[in-house]
Amino acid sequence: MKPHEYKFVKLHDLEEVMKIIHSLNVVDEEKIPTWEANGRVLSRDAVVPIDVPPMHRAAYDGYAVRSVDVTHVPARLRLIGSVSIGSVPNMELGPMETAYVTTGAYLPKNADAVVPEEYVEVLGNGEVVVNKSVRPWDNVDPAGSFARRGDVALREGTVVMPWDIPALLELGIGEVWVRRKVRIYIVATGSELVEAREPNDIANAIISGKVVESTASMIKNYINTYIPYAEVVGKTIVPDDPRAIERAVVHGINSADIVITTGGTGPSEVDYIYEVMQALKPRVYVRGLRMRPGRPTGIAVLENNKVVINLSGHPISTLNALTVIVKEVIKQMAGVKVGPPEPRVRAKLVRGSLGDRELARQYRVRVVKRGDEYIIEEIPKQGSSLTHTLLMINGLVFTGRGHIVNEGEYVEVLLLRQPFNLSDESNL
């Protein structure tokens, strides 16, 4: 297979690509119930609709009192009833009267404090003795003390996390405006590819010279695991045929916001992605990035603002493009400004060096924890075809073009798994 010179890749700086990415339009918005918003991106501020709490409420189990009645203790009060959380009291306290309240219950009218029950003696004749004085608003959550109507609870662009939902509901926010999920369609190209269907077929396919499709599946699994505000709406395998590839890509464009292709990005006579992209007449097309692995990566923006991303067929090259390019495209189109944190640590390089004068690089590394320090213990062979090395690592190091990390220096590591703890004897 001869390479075609017109297909040779001209490398572009990542900064150029990021400018294109950050100019992409965001997807439409929709209103959904708050309890369905986990992992979604707010398209508008989540605004508190009422004062919270709307009435004074008890912060402890105990006895609601008028603080003026227990200035001097012990004080004998008449017990007129009780209030539990989930109801609105229809009683009011008169002089020297009290009511039992549970945590979170609204206070009877005229009550301005709660005496915790351990400081109260029940006499059994409808009276109690209070043995601790309280000041106004002691052990009480006053009306509006959590939030006022019109307060912003979460800002637009925030990814809603599981723990945000109960807090939003407590503030009375029953629905929120979010970006719809970014839709993604994946096209795996290659006449050598076969779909994994039966476990016993995998080894037989390899022996017969076929390649079990795994790169597109990795993309789908990565999105499902790490990008909750996106969804893969389809995935297909097509042979090395330009018409078949173009039909699959056009189908993806009609059903998704982003089409991701794998394979066919090289300059050989059976690599057709370049021809397909030219036929689409993109408004913007960058092919070839100054990064390794993943130099043949391409990104195109069409006239209808749909995006097509071309990735290598090698999982390792695609993993780099996923974490550096694809994730940023999806974040931009989803309108993400505040997303979930990534598991990153600063680790010490104890031997060798990392980095490249001409290319941005991603390295697969093994990180261990020794005491309070993270150490890059092992760097396996870095070839993009060595997919099995993904089982030997637990982190990725990204170095920008021209950035060199020398022995003894620290570098940021994106963790893929928990680091091995050398100080924990249970791991030995």
Features from the language model and the residues they span:
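Solvent-exposed alpha-helices and their adjacent loops that cap or buttress functional pockets
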Residues: 56-58, 69-72, 90-94, 107, ...
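C-terminal terminal segments
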Residues: 3, 57, 129, 148, ...
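Short, low-complexity N-terminal leaders and the immediately following helix N-cap/first helix
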Residues: 1-74, 100, 336-364, 427-428
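Short beta-strand/loop turn elements enriched in aromatics
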Residues: 30-34, 55-77, 110-125, 367-390
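Helix-rich terminal scaffold detector
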Residues: 2-11, 174-311, 315-325, 428
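A charged, well-structured terminal subsegment
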Residues: 322-343
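Residue-level signal for inorganic ion chemistry
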Residues: 21, 62, 150, 186, ...
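Short, glycine/charged-enriched hinge/interface segments at domain edges or termini
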Residues: 2-8, 12, 24, 63-234, ...
